[in-house]
Amino acid sequence: MSENFAAFAYLVSGVMFIMALRGLSHPTTSRQGNTYGMVGMAIAIVTTLLLAKPSASGLAMIVAGLAIGGGAGAYIARKIAMTSMPQLVAGFHSLVGLAAVLVAAAALYAPHAFGIGEVGEIHAQALIEMSLGVAIGAITFTGSIIAFLKLDGRMSGKPIMLPMRHVINAALLIGIVVLIGVLVASESYTVFWLIVALSLALGVLLIVPIGGADMPVVVSMLNSYSGWAAAGIGFTLGNLALIITGALVGSSGAILSYIMCKGMNRSFISVILGGFGGETAAAGSDDIDRSVKLGSADDAAFLMSNASKVIIVPGYGMAVAQAQHAVRELADKLKEQGVEVKYAIHPVAGRMPGHMNVLLAEANVPYDEVFELEDINSEFAQADVAYVIGANDVTNPSARDDKSSPIYGMPILDVDKARTCLFVKRSLGSGYAGIDNTLFYKDSTMMLLGDAKKMTDDIVKAMEN
């Protein structure tokens, strides 16, 4: 295959990836977007193989790698629970970062295979590209592993605040920059692995102090990092498709991070600096009655059956209990009785961007019933019932009313303005941000303590009876 034709094929592949992003931007076109992405990737892989012209043994290794990776991917796709999707995304990001490190190492030890010079005579531009790629890749690798452990509950979701962490991070960053300069001048293997070691440490230290409330931003941020790492691999390999794809992923992840930060009324820098989610004080505890109104499934069934409009607000509690199908059944039962039902989604609900949308799509909830915060917030005042399922921090009135609250200014869903708020939660404990929710103590709120799926199922049964 000629290089000109390969460049054209890579361009077509890049266009397919752009169309994939376009398709994935809306639930109704998401399947089409996935198809575009798969076609684009197939074109890129076939073009690369035809351009490389591997030997028989090399081709056998490539096929074996594709079989192992494809088999593992197919197995994961079939077995993974939708509730574990944030962990899966973080895991995939770590693999991209690791790939960047390994490709950079291969290029350093065998530069002739990459067309970037000979050992001891690698082009300076290639060394700079290689260094940046390995630094970003290593940071992405360990940062994504920490995010995975936090999301999977294997590490505390609370911020781990190390003393002088900002000084340490700054020192590591300066050290990486200095070592990159040394590597370009010396091509030292030792310096290369020092860059890897410092970058791995920086990846851990950047994510460890970030609390669970900021996890959606962290996931999108790591998504951006993985994209730039892939672009770095593309420059090292001289692969146009990887450069295009990496730039697309990197820029889209950065934009998504900005949107997430805007949805939390926080700056991107404040998220990176970490620490949010460590507060344990009960916001507004001095001027509210601490008593709560407890209810049962029968109470909730009566209130919703006699309502004319119900807004369902899913949160991480729905994901943990895998209650999305039960919620869909409840909505169908309400609609049979002539009740208007809508779903309200907060942009940072759950543990990754679009987490709730994915779960509702799995339960085949009609897309025209799902609304974002800015589109539905004004309707809570006209709703008879707001049915909240574990959406804790994103419904906390302290963010709107209490200037002393750590989450003050974060846009929330105004569920407290509904005539009645039914809040399903396992306990009265604070949310992932570590802040008490003043919504629990309002006269219009009825707490339904228990597992979200069982409670919703019990409400459906009570309505049938």
Report each predicted region and the residues it spans:
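Structured cytosolic domains appended to multi-pass membrane proteins
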Residues: 288-465
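Mobile "lid/hinge" segments at catalytic clefts and subdomain interfaces of large enzymes
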Residues: 211, 225-269
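Cytoplasmic-side transmembrane-helix entry/capping segments in multi-pass membrane proteins
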Residues: 31-40, 62-64, 84-96, 159-170, ...
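Transmembrane helix-loop junctions at the membrane interface of multipass transporters and ion channels
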Residues: 53, 106-120, 185-190, 217, ...
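C-terminal ends of transmembrane helices
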Residues: 16-29, 70-89, 144-159, 202-215, ...
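Structural signature of hydrophobic alpha-helical transmembrane segments
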Residues: 1-14, 51-71, 126-141, 187-198
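Transmembrane alpha-helix boundary signature
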Residues: 48-63, 75-84, 101-119, 186
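Membrane-interfacial segments at transmembrane helix termini in multi-pass membrane proteins
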Residues: 248-307
